């Protein structure tokens, strides 16, 4: 009898050890599932790019915004997902020695006002009211689709703003201001209305860090060109145009973005380091406490690129129709019968590099360790209840 009790205790101890080991394995699987859950599950990217300044001497603010616009388009975000707001038309300004151009580099090396620029809000349309309406979706029904931010709860949104500001405010066209409280409340409305998944806010203005101090909504990451009490300085004066071409912070951010491609694994921590005080003169700042993910795990392309990897080309492609594919028999009584085979135009496209989309994560299922742990628990309860002498009835 004593031997049977000893064997029963030993079996119970063994089952308990197995249960703990299997439980730890199950816990590790659950942690992996949780990590996958907190990855950005966005399905689309949007950009709202805003220049709030008028007049020729603010040429650099328009160039800032158009440079960011050029970068996000190059990385795959289409015009249909970009809301571009320019408070003044520098390309057609009478003082512009090169009409229909806006340059961001010295000696007129890079024209950021190309043939395909689509400005959604221009001149006096760029107001605090219109900006807040775009963010919150409170716009008249007659507003065209191109002027709407049609985001949802799976959208990652980049919001870039540049202009003149101060401690807790940003000026719009020297006639009105938006405060950091109004901006924070607008972002909260967006969160409550499920208009974004994650939001990246970048502002290039004097005392820019004051604009994100009042943020309180989740999943927001913010960057600014200067701390409270600091000015954000301009860069690259051009004697031919007579004004500075860009601001320092945006200039170095754009230099950084020029090295990014749609398949890049560069993360947000790298973006935080692009403009040290030795280059910017001001002290750039960032805020990540509201953001759920670690910035080192957030790719630059999660905000600046397209979810669907695309390759942009300016080459004109002439697609040839295959005569064999085009052959199809039409019924006498049906005039619009579909072709027998689809045209395989994709094979003719000059794809330089195929960028594979990450496979979709499988639906959650109980990990293997969980099942093993459950069996160990059943065995331990059996030993406790009946003892080892009943094992012969099982086997």
From Swiss-Prot:
Pfam families: Peptidase_C13. PANTHER family: GPI-ANCHOR TRANSAMIDASE. Residues 231-236 are annotated as: Autoinhibitory loop. GO terms for cellular component: GPI-anchor transamidase complex. It is found in: Endoplasmic reticulum membrane. A protein binds at residues 206, 232, 234. Residues 28-368 are lumenal. Ca(2+) binds at residues 79, 82, 118, 120. Keywords: Calcium, Disulfide bond, Endoplasmic reticulum, GPI-anchor biosynthesis, Membrane, Metal-binding, Signal, Transferase, Transmembrane, Transmembrane helix. GO terms for molecular function: GPI-anchor transamidase activity. In the absence of proproteins substrates, exists in an inactive state with a disrupted catalytic site by an autoinhibitory loop. The binding of proprotein substrates, particularly the CSP region, to GPI-T triggers concerted conformational changes that alleviate the inhibition by the autoinhibitory loop. Meanwhile, proprotein residues near the omega- site induce the formation of a catalytic cleft for catalysis, following which the products are released and GPI-T reverts to the inactive state. This is GPI-anchor transamidase.
């Amino acid at each position: 009898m004593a031997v049977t009790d000893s064997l029963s205790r030993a079996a119970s101890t063994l089952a308990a050890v197995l249960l703990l080991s299997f439980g730890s394995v199950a816990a590790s699987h659950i942690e992996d599932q949780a990590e996958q859950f907190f990855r950005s599950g966005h399905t689309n990217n949007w950009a709202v790019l805003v220049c709030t300044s008028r007049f020729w001497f603010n040429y650099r603010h328009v160039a800032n915004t158009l440079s960011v616009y050029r970068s996000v388009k190059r990385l795959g975000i289409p015009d249909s997902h970009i809301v571009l707001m320019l408070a003044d038309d520098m390309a057609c300004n009478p003082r512009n020695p090169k009409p229909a151009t806006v340059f961001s580099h010295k000696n007129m090396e890079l024209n950021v006002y190309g043939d395909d620029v689509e400005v959604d809000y221009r001149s006096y349309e760029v107001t605090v009211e219109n900006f807040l309406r775009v963010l919150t979706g409170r716009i008249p029904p007659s507003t065209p689709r191109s002027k709407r931010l049609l985001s949802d709860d799976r959208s990652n949104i980049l919001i870039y703003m540049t202009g003149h500001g101060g401690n807790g405010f940003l000026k719009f066209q020297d006639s009105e201001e938006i405060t950091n409280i109004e901006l924070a409340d607008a972002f909260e409305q967006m969160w409550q209305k499920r208009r974004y998944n994650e939001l990246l806010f970048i502002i290039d203005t004097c005392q820019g860090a004051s604009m994100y101090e009042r943020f309180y909504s989740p999943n927001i990451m913010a960057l600014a060109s200067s701390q409270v009490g600091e000015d954000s300085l301009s860069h690259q004066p051009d004697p031919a145009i007579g004004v500075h071409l860009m601001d320092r912070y945006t200039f170095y951010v754009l230099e950084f973005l020029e090295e990014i491609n749609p398949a890049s694994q560069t993360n947000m921590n790298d973006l935080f380091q692009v403009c040290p005080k030795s280059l910017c003169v001001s002290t750039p700042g960032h805020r990540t406490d509201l953001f759920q993910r670690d910035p080192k795990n957030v790719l630059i392309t999660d905000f600046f690129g397209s979810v669907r990897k695309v390759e942009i080309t300016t080459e004109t492609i002439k697609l040839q129709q295959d005569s064999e594919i085009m052959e199809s028999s039409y019924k006498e009584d049906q005039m619009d019968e579909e072709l027998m085979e689809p045209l395989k135009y994709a094979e003719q496209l000059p794809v330089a590099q195929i960028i594979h989309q990450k496979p979709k994560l499988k639906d959650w299922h109980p990990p293997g360790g969980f099942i093993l742990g459950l069996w160990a628990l059943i065995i331990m309860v059996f030993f406790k209840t009946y003892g080892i002498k009943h094992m012969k009835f099982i086997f």
